């Protein structure tokens, strides 16, 4: 049969040839150990075949031969940092609602944009509606099922493995919403993964356990006064494993002046109750609030990391932004508030990052709010990078969990661990004995996996954890996502590090804590992993009796 000449081919056939040529060049570059600029290759190859449009990334990904998928997918993945920690994060927003403390303080916090009564009226509290997550939520009319399905589809098209999902429930104080709405919202998150239509939260969780796409955790944003015993019990029922608590400042006068509507004592209580229930605690902190100043800001972060009443597991650092329609905007306009200069802010963030202990993870260093909406505050979109560069100039290292993760190190610095060993760090926090176990390469300061073990205090209110129980609050092996049922020798997930960490945790609980039982706060989708190693479900926890 006579082969068609290039001029006889249709645009669709030319596009297929272009895609094949792009993949061939990628394979050759891989075999020669060369780095390749994908955009340049796409442009050049499309021009070679006389096409005005480049081939889409989605089509290239779909056409990669099976034997080359493992080596080429990391090169084709858009924004590889999204799944570098081993999990695809899906942020969803609940419907707009008023801040719960308006009823007794008379107003919202002075710096807070958004909400039903704000200039950004279709946005949720503390968001403007122009953040990427907000815009996705508005497009889906705040429907939790659609938000989840759309985001997962988007991540898949960009070449990410969406085998494990962690939800972040954003949009103000979720736990202040009516119970009926909360149940509907969480039920739909689980149903979006499992494909089942549930009648209640218990049914949704049951089907989510066996879902192909695993829900390995749910994070809920809340306030210290909505983090009490009944709220924590409800969140455990939902399959929530991590809390993001809005602290903002450890100073009582600042909390009062900014109209927070809760005390610092409430912050300490909420941390204690949350950790004794097994939750991981991430704090939101805001440097550059009114009436603080640089030195006082540094002092509060020193206090925050060193005082056992605080010591969070994670931190989101949100330098104060002046946004129109807020009380702070009026103070700024009248000259009664002035933001730090850009250089002072970079210096401050660098000094804060230098204080972070190796068991704390810094999740974010600034808000996602678009710069045109910011009247005063952060002027750079890459504040974390600038702060890390400043630390490098000063000869200081940032030793938080995220900076040392194996997946992040591989993407940013192309370094891989060489000699891995077990490292143990013990500290006291919120009335309990904490042990941070990790597998690390100490020479290169790379973290492969971690486990947080706590000897619960006697004040724990959950009956499953009473009478001397140790709880594993987090088990995480880092590196790009590897599906739960498979192994990849070049990735660090599913290579046995998780099992080794669990064995050491059980030994410490039995021999050092003197515990007769160990519990795990497990994401709904990872419960079967613990069943395989001898755990059973008791309430929301996976538990095992220790001999």
Swiss-Prot record:
Keyword vocabulary terms for this entry: 4Fe-4S, Acyltransferase, Amyotrophic lateral sclerosis, Cytoplasm, Iron, Iron-sulfur, Metal-binding, Methylation, Neurodegeneration, Neurogenesis, Nucleus, Phosphoprotein, RNA-binding, S-adenosyl-L-methionine, Transferase, tRNA processing, tRNA-binding
Residue ranges of every copy of the N-acetyltransferase domain listed in the record: 396-547
Top-level class of the enzyme under EC nomenclature: transferase
Effect of mutating residue 329 to F: No effect on tyrosine phosphorylation
Function, as annotated: Catalytic tRNA acetyltransferase subunit of the elongator complex which is required for multiple tRNA modifications, including mcm5U (5-methoxycarbonylmethyl uridine), mcm5s2U (5-methoxycarbonylmethyl-2-thiouridine), and ncm5U (5-carbamoylmethyl uridine). In the elongator complex, acts as a tRNA uridine(34) acetyltransferase by mediating formation of carboxymethyluridine in the wobble base at position 34 in tRNAs.
NCBIfam families: ELP3 (TIGR01211)
Residues at which acetyl-CoA binds: 164, 474-477, 497-499, 530
Descriptive protein name: Elongator complex protein 3
Gene Ontology terms: cellular component: cytoplasm; cytosol; elongator holoenzyme complex; nucleolus; nucleus
Summary of the tissues where the protein is detected: Expressed in the cerebellum and spinal motor neurons.
Pathway annotation: tRNA modification; 5-methoxycarbonylmethyl-2-thiouridine-tRNA biosynthesis
Catalytic activity, EC: 2.3.1.311
Family from the record: Belongs to the ELP3 family.
Record-level Gene Ontology MF annotations: 4 iron, 4 sulfur cluster binding; acetyltransferase activity; metal ion binding; phosphorylase kinase regulator activity; tRNA binding; tRNA uridine(34) acetyltransferase activity
Description of how the protein assembles with itself and partners: Component of the elongator complex which consists of ELP1, ELP2, ELP3, ELP4, ELP5 and ELP6. ELP1, ELP2 and ELP3 form the elongator core complex. Interacts with alpha-tubulin.
Phosphotyrosine modified-residue sites: 202, 251
Reactions that this protein is recorded to catalyse: uridine(34) in tRNA + acetyl-CoA + S-adenosyl-L-methionine + H2O = 5-(carboxymethyl)uridine(34) in tRNA + 5'-deoxyadenosine + L-methionine + CoA + 2 H(+)
PTM description: Tyrosine-phosphorylated; phosphorylation on Tyr-202 does not affect elongator complex integrity or ELP3 protein stability. Also serine/threonine-phosphorylated.
Cofactor annotation comment: Binds 1 [4Fe-4S] cluster. The cluster is coordinated with 3 cysteines and an exchangeable S-adenosyl-L-methionine.
GO biological process: central nervous system development; neuron migration; positive regulation of cell migration; regulation of transcription by RNA polymerase II; regulation of translation; tRNA wobble base 5-methoxycarbonylmethyl-2-thiouridinylation; tRNA wobble uridine modification
All copies of domain Radical SAM core, residue ranges: 82-372
Modified residues annotated as Phosphoserine in this record: 161
Compartments it resides in: Cytoplasm; Nucleus
Origin: domain of life: Eukaryota
Binding annotation for [4Fe-4S] cluster: 99, 109, 112
